[in-house]
Regions:
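Catalytic phosphate/nucleotide-handling subdomain of diverse soluble enzymes
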Residues: 2-76
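Acidic, glycine/GT-rich loop-and beta-edge segments that sit at the periphery of enzyme/chaperone cores
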Residues: 62-122
Length: 122
């Protein structure tokens, strides 16, 4: 739900994503299949998921060891969008709807739906 909301806010869809990064120790130890099954993450092709580990530490290290990267920071900052959830229409309702496992709209999770059908659970 959060991913769908953020994509909608910037005018993109899941099909526009080349990669889906799950950073930090959480991402490294996460079972992607289980996370998709319960609706935590979108039902993307699994090869689109990247779990880079401690990406903030890796980024800081790269910047400290290659000062030429400083010139890229301004470009990156210009591309950042702030989205205030306090002003988001229907955000709370969408989050409540997403609290069901796997999700209130199973059609958003076609691989999960297929698994449930195969097991006779739908």
């Amino acid at each position: 739900t959060m991913v769908a909301f953020l994509l909608e806010e910037v005018g993109l869809t899941l099909n526009d994503l080349d990669k889906f990064y799950v950073a930090g120790a959480f991402g490294v130890h996460l079972d992607i299949e289980s996370a998709v099954t319960i609706g935590m993450y979108p039902d993307l092709p699994r090869e689109k998921f990247e779990c880079p580990g401690n990406s903030s530490l890796k980024g800081a290290y790269k910047l400290l060891t290659d000062r030429n990267l400083l010139s890229e920071i301004d470009d990156i900052v210009e591309k950042i969008n702030y989205i205030g959830l306090e002003d988001a229409k229907d955000f709370i309702e969408k989050m409540r709807a997403a609290s069901f496992l796997p999700h209130t709209n199973i059609d958003n999770y076609p691989t999960v739906k297929q698994k449930l059908l195969e097991r006779g659970l739908l």
